[in-house]
Amino acid sequence: MTRSILSYTLRTFLLLFFCFAPLIGSTAEVFIEAESFQKRGGWKLDTQFIQQMGSPYLLAHGLGRPVDDAVTKFNIGESGNYRLWVRTKDWVARWNATASPGKFQIIIDGKPANATFGTNGVQWGWHDGGIIALEKGTNELRLKDLTGFDGRCDCIYLTTETDQPPPPADTVLSEWRREQLGLAANPENRGPYDLVVIGGGYAGMGSALSAARMGCRVALVQDRPVLGGNGSSEVRVWAKGNIRRGKFPRIGEIIEEISDNAKKSPGTYEEFGDELKERVIRDEPNIDLLLNHHAHRVDMDGNRITAVHALDTRTGSEVKIIGDYFADCTGHGWIGTWAKADLDMSPNGRMGMSNMWAWDELDTPTAFPETPWALDLQMADFPYPRDHHGQWFWESGFDKDAIGDAEGIRDWNLRAVYGAFNAMKNRDGAAKHPNAILTWVAFVGGPRESRRLMGDVVLTEDDIVAKKEFPDGCVPSTWSIDLHYPKEQYAKKYADNPFISKAVHGKGVDRSYGYPVPYRCFYSRNIDNLFMAGRCISVTHEALGTVRVMKTCGMMGEVVGKAASICAINDCQPRDVYESHLDELLTLLKLPGKAHRSTPSAEIIIPSDALPLAGPRGPANGMEISKLAGIVIDDELAKFTGNWTSGTGLPNYVRYSYKYTGPNTNATATFKFTVPKAGRYSIEAFSQAHPNRSTKTPVTVRHNDSISEYVINQRLKSKDDVVGITDLKLAEQDEVIVTIGTKGADGTIHVDAVRLLEIE
């Protein structure tokens, strides 16, 4: 920890030194990265498009209300006339939209520059701010937002060389930018680590936690200030995919520790638990967490990655992270791309990016600015945002460049949201929404599909539907094959780039047990030390429809982390885990999620607070038999004849569900007991009351050679939802058979569990 603090302090000192040091040479100049402002005010740090435009930038995301100024101080070494250059863009100019919504000013020592910024340029470039007279010494600079509609600023350059603009700065840490920042030619080294995980979403967190608990020294690199990816408070997609089930029901226990419990998507900030996720990661002594670090290239030795270079998105400094194994959990497959891993990307028809949003209603009327630059929408052009939120289907970019034009896709989504809210406030929806306000719009996009890195197995839709078995099948994928397409109803007005989607759910996935995704989808087939987890794993476009949801991605990470520990012990490649150490991996997958060891070769410790082992269908949602008195047999173990339907709608059922059927159908449910010791026992049925249940449900009890018939009332609410059938005096090893029938019933017959309870 001390080393990390000192390292960060040194980088900060160097950056401030180059801003405040006296200027030398024939040309005086000052370069200020917007992200390094001492006070950002209401401006957001946007790191999503560094690969496309070269840098993080500040974004005035105020939902139509100007944000507070960003403020910093800088030093001028000599008085004089300086030309002001600002790297920015007019973010709607590419669509020939009018009014330039992203306007802002530069104010130096209380005086605004002559130019208004955010009004020029389809692409990122230098906007000439004119000549400014500056005095030697400390000066104050402010970014003043004028609109609240996503003005953006990358950097500011002041120079006494007034004739030429600075060079382009589209590449990450270009030579010119390095020179201005005073960065050393060789970055600071971190590591070596057993595993370097790039990407702090569910896949990355699962990989890091799993590897660390199996004794690996891990670096977790995340380009945002929070963890969770699409499942963070910045994007607010609730985490889906059933966990703790299938062949290895211990997989998912780690993800359960960090999962949200959001009631909506998008939900509230608090529901997504950013602080919880960070705390769980930081509590692991084997993990070094690098938030606000954007990986931008790799070093290679043949087919092996030796290091990842990452940019500190707050200071512009760079670190080189050295490791033995690397896990690409970036979603877009960036690490694999730079390493020249085999990959695939559907040329069109991909799933898009969503920017969800929320609104509310106050007690008094509110105003919202007209948005002539947004999409030109009326209320019929979009689905009404019910329950005050715009959901996952606010999605676009299906046939657009999901990598090279990700910023354009995000911006199109913003134009759609603002255009829709403008319709609600200022057009044909105005009469019904006088008090409506925008409360939240995601400026961080939630992408679904781009590159997929190829492994030794490329999983297909046919594999999943046919339930093809692989010896290394492990991660249970329980989401349907869910692919998104433009929704025809709303696609006509903007046919080139529809902004509302529909989900088409395929069949064939067992959503209770899950399809076991093979381990060989989680490592590169041509980069020797590269794992992957998340939506960039080795699957086809169609198969991605089931594996891409976040809890499933997190479970991939759990498998990757354990495989990395086997690689560390045996000094082998990820492929060797399948070919030579598969039994070791499958053994580790049976460990509780909280099992841990200090090093990959140390003894494994299972703590007392480990979760109980779930069954193949996952943790029971109802009452656990182990917590009930007596001998309880659930309907899972009963013998049924006829047609029965499983249900979970009535509370207080035992384990997974109950079953029900209609009267007089000749259907039966039979429960067989062997008495463990002699005594008098009450025979009882667990039965959740409902007005449509039978009051005359027939029950037959067979004991030795005797057969007795009873009738129970399942409509009447009973204590603890248990209905008594009869009492019997029983000998040890007696057999008791209880059959619930339908003949003569006057309502729905309900079958849950049956119990023998010894009467003291």
Where are these regions (language model features)?
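Extracytoplasmic
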Residues: 27-188, 620-760
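N-terminal secretory signal peptides that target proteins for export/translocation
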Residues: 1-10
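Conserved N-terminal/central alpha/beta ligand/cofactor-binding core
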Residues: 210, 216-217, 222-301, 351-354, ...
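Flavin (FAD/FMN)-binding glycine-rich loop and adjacent Rossmann-like elements that form
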Residues: 182-189, 230, 307, 317-622
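Beta1/beta-strand and adjacent pyrophosphate-binding region of the FAD-binding site
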Residues: 189-201
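N-terminal Rossmann-fold NAD(P) dinucleotide-binding loop
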Residues: 204
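Conserved beta-strand-loop-beta-strand element in the redox core of flavoprotein oxidoreductases
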Residues: 299-319
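Bacterial N-terminal signal peptides
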Residues: 11-22
